[in-house]
UniProtKB/Swiss-Prot annotation:
Protein name: BUB3-interacting and GLEBS motif-containing protein ZNF207
PROSITE patterns, sorted: ZINC_FINGER_C2H2_1 (PS00028)
Chief site of localization: nucleus
BP GO terms, sorted: attachment of spindle microtubules to kinetochore; cell division; microtubule bundle formation; microtubule polymerization; mitotic sister chromatid segregation; mitotic spindle assembly; mitotic spindle assembly checkpoint signaling; protein stabilization
Domain notes: The GLEBS region mediates interaction with bub3. Mainly composed of disordered low-complexity regions outside of the C2H2-type zinc fingers. Coacervation depends on hydrophobic and aromatic Phe and Tyr in the disordered low-complexity region, that may promote coacervation by forming intermolecular hydrophobic interactions.
Its biological purpose: Kinetochore- and microtubule-binding protein that plays a key role in spindle assembly. Znf207/BuGZ is mainly composed of disordered low-complexity regions and undergoes phase transition or coacervation to form temperature-dependent liquid droplets. Coacervation promotes microtubule bundling and concentrates tubulin, promoting microtubule polymerization and assembly of spindle and spindle matrix by concentrating its building blocks.
Effect of Y452S: In xBuGZ13S: Impaired coacervation
Compartments where located: Nucleus; Chromosome, Centromere, Kinetochore; Cytoplasm, Cytoskeleton, Spindle
Organism listed in the record: Xenopus laevis
Zinc finger motifs (C2H2-type), residue ranges: 11-34, 35-58
Length: 452
């Protein structure tokens, strides 16, 4: 077998007996504490190097290593880190560390034994508490004066009810302990464990815990057969809530009327058809005063108009547009009729109406009794032709100058243009005035009074 290696010691300083985690840190410590020149503060590596530096540079002699413990101040001993330490000092260091390790182990073992003993001491009071509970179980239960002792619930020791804190009664005239209930207000286990108890219907599976069965008012325990007289007296003393509805209170005026109306519509029971179930008419409710009366009146008028239109769809509406005149608003709101479009209303204006001659009345001519010829000369109206109308021109004749000559037209000669202003009797004539120039030809220069 190979030789067993000795356990490597942790880095430590031989001069001051101090432990370090790393040998590099130990070397830095020795240079700063033990091998530093006290004159020029130069850091050297060994003790002999410090002595030589002081002798050659400062002409001084050093006989001891600074900051060293007594007995380890030899300046001639060359130690660098862990190297150069005497063997006897290394063995002594190992022996000291082993003793220290043994002492620490003994302390840990002693502390562990003490902790085990403390745990045993902690478990002792629990047994005494159980004994005390057992002794209290044999003690008779004490109730309030005038009330017999309460029977313990099945499955619970008799002394548990005496350990529970008493609660003062919530209703005057009713004791806080009743038959079938414990002092803390909890129902007895017997009533819950026996669903077919006489006088109480069986517990329903759909009811959550804490909800009384149907037929019992919340807050009243079930009546037992042992004390029927006491339970009936308690029930008779309970105040009956009044069924009469409270008087209607005045509704405060909201800051924003729309929000107040929304709240008024939302409040109240609602049926399956999303209609309020109360029979109070809406007209009896007092409407709050709106912040903006003009807009509110316009909304009310629009609503009333819509309701009247829906109720009477067969009647024709010829009413004028509704005009709102308010004292608080400066604007004037006009609401046109919804059944008539804006185009139809505009067509009814007088400027779009056509003046048709009545029977027995002479036609009205915008141009007077004379008409203007093609060259601007005045021409007398011919008999048998309708007068010219201003702003009207008829389309080209079907055969005109591009086809066969017109037949049956008075004053027309073949090969020539028909006189300007004439045409079929049923076609309105052209507008009088000078002819337009052809494309690409400049108009003639006329006098100062002419059109050009």
């Amino acid at each position: 077998m190979g030789r067993k290696k000795k356990k490597q010691l942790k880095p430590w300083c031989w001069y001051c007996n101090r432990d370090f985690d790393d040998e590099k840190i130990l070397i830095q410590h020795q240079k700063a504490k033990h091998f530093k020149c006290h004159i020029c503060h130069k850091k050297l590596y060994t003790g002999p190097g410090l002595a030589i530096h002081c002798m050659q540079v400062h002409k001084e002699t050093i006989d001891a290593v600074p900051n060293a413990i007594p007995g380890r101040t030899d300046i001639e001993l060359e130690i660098y880190g862990m190297e150069g330490i005497p063997e006897k000092d290394m063995e002594e260091r190992r022996r000291i560390l082993e003793q220290k390790t043994q002492v620490d182990g003994q302390k840990k073992k002693t502390n562990q034994d003490d902790s085990d003993y403390d745990d045993d001491d902690d478990t002792a009071p629990s047994t005494s508490f159980q004994q005390m509970q057992t002794q209290q179980a044999f003690m008779p239960t004490m109730g309030q004066p005038g009330i017999p002792g309460l029977p313990g619930a099945p499955g619970m020791p008799p002394g548990i009810t005496s350990l529970m804190p008493a609660v003062p009664p919530l209703i005057s005239g009713i004791p806080h302990v009743m038959a079938g209930m414990h002092p803390h207000g909890m129902m007895s286990m017997g009533g819950m464990m026996h669903p077919h108890r006489p006088g109480i219907p069986p517990m329903m599976a759909g009811l959550p815990p804490g909800v009384p069965p149907p037929g019992l008012r919340p807050g009243i325990p079930p009546v037992t057969q042992a004390q029927p007289a006491l339970s009936q007296a308690v029930v008779s003393r309970l105040p009956v809530p009044s069924t009469s509805a409270p008087a209607l209170q005045s509704v405060p005026k909201p800051l924003f009327p729309s929000a107040g109306q929304a709240q008024a519509h939302i409040s109240g029971p609602v049926g399956t058809d999303f209609k309020p179930l109360n029979n109070i008419p809406a007209t009896t409710a007092e409407h709050p005063k709106p912040t903006f009366p003009a807009y509110t009146q316009s909304t009310m008028s629009t609503t009333s108009t819509t309701n009247s239109t829906a109720s009477k769809p067969s009647t024709s509406i010829t009413s004028k547009p509704a005009t709102l005149t308010t004292t608080s608003a400066t604007s004037k709101l006009v609401h046109p009729d919804e059944d008539i479009s804006l185009e139809e209303k505009r067509a009814q204006l007088p400027k779009y109406q056509r003046n048709l001659p009545r029977p027995g009345q002479a036609p009205i001519s915008n141009m007077g009794s004379t008409a203007v010829g093609p060259l601007g000369a005045m021409m007398a109206p011919r008999p048998g032709l309708p007068p010219q109308q201003h702003g009207m021109r008829h389309p080209l004749p079907p055969h005109g100058q591009y086809g066969a000559p017109l037949q049956g037209m008075a004053g027309y000669h073949p090969g020539t243009m028909p006189p300007f202003g004439q045409g079929p009797p049923m076609v309105p004539p052209f507008q009088g005035g000078p002819p337009r120039p052809l494309m690409g030809i400049r108009p003639p220069v006329m006098s100062q009074g002419g059109r050009y």
